[in-house]
């Protein structure tokens, strides 16, 4: 049923009151002035229905007279009149665009369903009560207030000192590293220790080649990488072994003679304790770590080995394991000043590990007979009280190993040549 606006219902009631039924009973039909009056209406009247009354709209209602007392001419005229009013009302509804406002369109979009969404609306609208908003606002305010009064002071009280200590620790390690490489840079020009560049490259690459050999043998795959790197390294194998033997003897000699106070620092001065605990030093030459470091404008290449202290106090749980139960007390470095690597590698340059291996091989090939100054540095692993010792002399061990040269003739024969 169509509901008419309030103003339209009032005007319809006034019209029906102005048209008396006396003139209709005389058979004259409508008043001659009725069409003019209807044309004068600004808005049309909705069509009448067969029910005796139109339902109420906003508290207003009106009622037509019974049509049984109206003549047939009047009924036909009334029917035409109501039909024209109905068409006019339809045009009015289209013009006014009832139930098609912007709010209605938004509501349709939010409530429309789609088969692609499981026959559910695209957007689900939640209604939040004002009580919930007030409660959430109060909770957030309470949390911020509690954080400000309790949590933040607690964080500053406990975690801020830890942050300061961590920053101090990082700076202290950086300072120790700078002091270490500063002493190395000072000692390199006046050292008496020498090493050929191919021997140094062999020290750097041999552990990598050895690991590749072990992996390829376990997996049953061709070790092309190791073969490619091992072409020139085989020639330096005996020289590398000779240098590692010298390194072991030289480190033990520095402890025996207490050079630079190294024995007193690591073992103390109690000879009775050495005998009682059966102190024994062991340098792990089978495992090393190759490193590149930049200090100021200089680049250092180094190979690092671990020095262990064995004693009765540190008995191994499993005797089959070589280094179990031994205490790692220091790192032994073999360091050279390396000019083969460009400085751009340390400034965010586009260099990879493959470039590192390539540079090592190219420098070995182009400088096969080049001799470089080197030093042996022993650095304790105690971070807070770290101390280092730099060895720059050959010692008795160097004099012994410097009396002969070792060269490999083929895969089976090795040649030892005494120097004059």
Curated annotation (Swiss-Prot):
It is found in: Mitochondrion; Mitochondrion membrane. It is a multi-pass membrane protein. The keyword Mitochondrion applies. Keywords: Membrane, Mitochondrion, Transmembrane, Transmembrane helix. The chain crosses the membrane at residues 125-145, 149-169. Signal peptide: none annotated. It comes from the Eukaryota. One of its GO terms (cellular component) is endoplasmic reticulum. The keyword Membrane applies. Component of MIOREX complexes, large expressome-like assemblies of ribosomes with factors involved in all the steps of post-transcriptional gene expression. Associates with the mitochondrial ribosome. Present with 450 molecules/cell in log phase SD medium. This is MIOREX complex component 9. It comes from Saccharomyces cerevisiae (strain ATCC 204508 / S288c). The gene is MRX9.
């Amino acid at each position: 049923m169509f509901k008419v606006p309030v103003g339209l219902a009032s005007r319809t009631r006034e019209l029906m009151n102005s048209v008396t039924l006396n003139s209709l009973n005389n058979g004259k039909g409508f008043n001659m002035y009725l069409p003019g009056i209807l044309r004068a209406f600004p808005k049309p009247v909705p069509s009448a229905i067969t029910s005796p009354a139109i339902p109420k709209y906003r508290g207003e209602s009106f009622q037509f007279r019974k049509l049984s007392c109206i003549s047939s001419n009047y009924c036909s005229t009334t029917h035409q009149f109501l039909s024209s009013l109905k068409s006019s009302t339809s045009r009015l509804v289209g013009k006014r665009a009832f139930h098609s406002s912007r709010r209605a369109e938004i509501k349709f979009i939010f409530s429309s369903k789609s088969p692609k969404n499981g026959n559910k609306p695209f957007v689900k609208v939640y209604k939040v009560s004002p009580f919930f908003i007030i409660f959430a606002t109060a909770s957030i305010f309470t949390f911020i207030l509690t954080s400000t009064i309790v949590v933040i002071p607690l964080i500053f009280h406990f975690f801020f000192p830890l942050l300061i200590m961590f920053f101090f620790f990082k700076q202290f390690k950086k300072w120790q590293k700078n002091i270490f490489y500063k002493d190395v840079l000072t000692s390199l020009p006046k050292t008496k220790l020498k090493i050929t560049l191919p021997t140094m490259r062999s020290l750097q690459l041999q552990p990598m080649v050895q690991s590749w050999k072990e992996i390829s043998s376990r997996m049953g795959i061709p070790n092309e990488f190791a073969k490619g790197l091992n072409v020139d390294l085989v020639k330096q194998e005996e020289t590398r072994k000779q240098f590692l033997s010298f390194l072991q003897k030289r480190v033990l000699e520095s402890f025996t003679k207490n050079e630079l106070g190294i024995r007193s620092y690591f073992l103390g001065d109690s000879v009775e304790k050495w005998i009682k605990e059966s102190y024994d030093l062991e340098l792990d030459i089978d495992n090393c770590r190759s490193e590149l470091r930049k200090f100021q404008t200089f680049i250092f290449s180094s190979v690092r080995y671990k020095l262990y202290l064995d004693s009765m106090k540190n008995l191994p749980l499993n005797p089959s394991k070589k280094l179990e139960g031994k205490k790692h007390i220091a790192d032994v470095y073999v360091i050279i000043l390396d000019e083969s690597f460009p400085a751009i590698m340390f400034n965010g340059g586009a260099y990879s590990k493959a470039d590192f291996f390539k540079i090592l091989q190219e420098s070995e090939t182009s400088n096969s007979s080049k001799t470089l100054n080197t030093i042996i540095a022993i650095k304790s692993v105690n971070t807070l009280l770290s101390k280092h010792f730099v060895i720059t002399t050959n010692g008795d061990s160097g004099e012994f190993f410097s009396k002969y040269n070792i060269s490999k003739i083929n895969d089976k024969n090795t040649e030892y040549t005494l120097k004059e």
